[in-house]
Regions:
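Conserved RNase H-like, two-metal-ion catalytic cores of nucleic-acid enzymes
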Residues: 1-56
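Metal-dependent phosphoesterase core characteristic of DEDDh/y 3'-5' exonuclease domains
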Residues: 21-34, 61-174
């Protein structure tokens, strides 16, 4: 089984991200590899989605792991890729959902009385001693508008690494 850790950042003009927001960065990492960050500002959204999906197709026995990927990242990728005509919604769902994605936020729900509150990645990371020092996700739009792409790259990269640490912690404590 090849584990692939995933995080996506969007340009969200509103207070809360939506499935229609533009994807500005996709970061992923195979378990024994380094983090790859695909950046919209170096190409465009359609190109980074196409490259990511092509990479996924090449992986045998894939398991995609992320924090809140079942409620946000994967539906967002499916919606945006479909909107760009990269593939049909059905093909995208088979590609991304058939490998049984693992969502670290969902894995913690029973221990949190089935409430999502308090299960943000930064909060979970702090509890396991894996705190990050990058800009908060709420600043991504501002950083993008300012052209501070380094901060966004560091943020999405750290989110992937933190998700991997959280997954390994959850797997260890059972």
């Amino acid at each position: 089984m090849t584990r692939l850790f995933l995080d996506v950042e969007t340009y969200s003009p509103g207070l809360k991200p939506t499935y229609d927001d533009r994807i500005i960065a996709i970061a992923y990492k195979q378990e024994d590899g380094s983090v790859t960050v695909l950046k919209e500002w170096e190409s465009d959204e359609k190109q980074i989605l196409t490259r990511f999906l092509e990479e996924i197709k090449r992986i045998d026995r894939l398991s995609i792991i992320g924090h809140n990927i079942l409620r946000f990242d994967l539906p967002l990728i499916i919606n945006r890729a479909s909107a760009h005509g990269i593939a049909s919604t059905g093909d995208l769902m088979r590609l991304l959902l058939d490998p049984y994605p693992i969502d670290t936020i969902q894995a913690q729900l029973p221990a949190n009385n089935f409430f999502f509150k308090g299960l943000g990645l930064a909060e979970c990371a702090k509890r396991i001693g894996a705190e990050t020092r990058t800009c908060p996700g709420s600043e991504i739009k501002t950083r993008y508008d300012e052209g501070d792409y380094t901060a966004i790259t560091e943020h999405v990269r750290e989110d992937v690494l933190t998700t991997e640490k959280l997954f390994n912690y959850l797997a260890q404590v059972g």
